[in-house]
Swiss-Prot record:
V-ATPase is a heteromultimeric enzyme composed of a peripheral catalytic V1 complex (main components: subunits A, B, C, D, E, and F) attached to an integral membrane V0 proton pore complex (main component: the proteolipid protein; which is present as a hexamer that forms the proton-conducting pore). Belongs to the V-ATPase proteolipid subunit family. It comes from Dictyostelium discoideum (Social amoeba). This is V-type proton ATPase proteolipid subunit. Proton-conducting pore forming subunit of the membrane integral V0 complex of vacuolar ATPase. V-ATPase is responsible for acidifying a variety of intracellular compartments in eukaryotic cells. InterPro entries: ATPase_proteolipid_c-like_dom (IPR002379), ATPase_proteolipid_csu (IPR000245), ATPase_proteolipid_su_C_euk (IPR011555), F/V-ATP_Csub_sf (IPR035921). One of its GO terms (biological process) is sorocarp development. It comes from the Eukaryota. One of its GO terms (cellular component) is contractile vacuolar membrane. It is found in: Vacuole membrane. The lineage of its organism: Eukaryota, Amoebozoa, Evosea, Eumycetozoa, Dictyostelia. Its main location: membrane. The keyword Lipid biosynthesis does not apply. GO terms for molecular function: proton-transporting ATPase activity, rotational mechanism.
C-alpha cells in the first residue's frame, strides 16, 4: 500500500499501471476458465468410467439373474451424481469470472484450484464407484446378502467426490476482488487523478 501511495504522489502513471496490471492482469480469467473446464472434464470422465465399468458387471449379472438388474443399477446412479458435482462447481465458478471487472490473479488461481479439486476428486470417486460397482454387482448376483456391503462401499466411494465438492465450494468463496488503484484513471498527460 505504501508503494502504491508513493507512486501516486510522484505522478508516475506507468508504475501505477504496472501495479494494477500485476494484481489484475488481463489473462486472469483464463485461469478461472481452466478451473471450470477441469472440473467438468474430470468429473465427467470419472462418471463415464464408473458408469461403463459398473454397467459391464450389471450386464453380466443380468444374464443369470435378470430379476436383480434394477437393484443392481444403483452404482450407475452413484456414478452419474459425480458429474452433477462437477456441474455444480462449474455454475458457481462461472458466476464469479468477470473479464471486464475486477478479477484478481489470486481469485483466478483459487478458482483453478477449486476446479481441479472437484475434478480430480470426482475422477477418483468415479473410478472407485466403477470398480466397486462391477465387482459388487457380480458378487451380489451370486450372494444377495452382499448387497448392503456393496452399498456401504459405494457410499464411501461417493463421499470422495463430495469431499472435493465441499473444498471446491470453500475455495471458490474466497473473495479477493480488490485491484490496487481500481479507482484511479490515468490522464493523457501522464498525471494520475483520484476517484471518478
Amino acid at each position: 500500500m505504501f508503494q502504491l501511495l508513493s507512486f501516486l504522489l510522484s505522478g508516475e502513471a506507468t508504475a501505477v499501471e504496472r501495479i494494477i496490471t500485476d494484481a489484475c492482469p488481463v489473462y486472469a480469467p483464463f485461469f478461472g476458465a481452466m478451473g471450470v473446464t477441469a472440473a467438468l472434464v474430470f468429473t465427467v470422465m470419472g462418471a463415464a468410467y464408473g458408469t461403463a465399468k459398473a454397467s459391464v458387471g450389471i450386464s453380466n449379472m443380468g444374464v443369470m439373474k435378470p430379476d436383480l438388474v434394477i437393484k443392481a443399477f444403483i452404482p450407475v446412479i452413484f456414478a452419474g451424481v459425480i458429474a452433477i458435482y462437477g456441474l455444480i462447481i462449474c455454475v458457481i465458478l462461472v458466476g464469479g469470472i468477470k473479464p471486464n471487472a475486477n478479477y484478481t490473479l489470486m481469485k483466478s488461481f483459487t478458482d483453478l484450484g477449486a476446479g481441479l479439486t472437484v475434478g480430480l476428486c470426482g475422477l477418483a470417486a468415479g473410478m472407485a464407484i466403477g470398480i466397486v460397482g462391477d465387482s459388487g454387482v457380480r458378487a451380489f448376483g451370486q450372494q444377495p446378502k452382499l448387497y448392503v456391503i456393496m452399498m456401504l462401499i459405494l457410499i464411501f466411494s461417493e463421499a470422495l467426490g463430495l469431499y472435493g465438492l465441499i473444498i471446491g465450494i470453500l475455495l471458490s468463496s474466497v473473495s479477493d476482488t480488490y485491484c490496487p488503484g481500481q479507482a484511479l484513471v490515468p490522464l493523457n498527460s501522464g498525471n494520475v487523478i483520484g476517484k471518478n
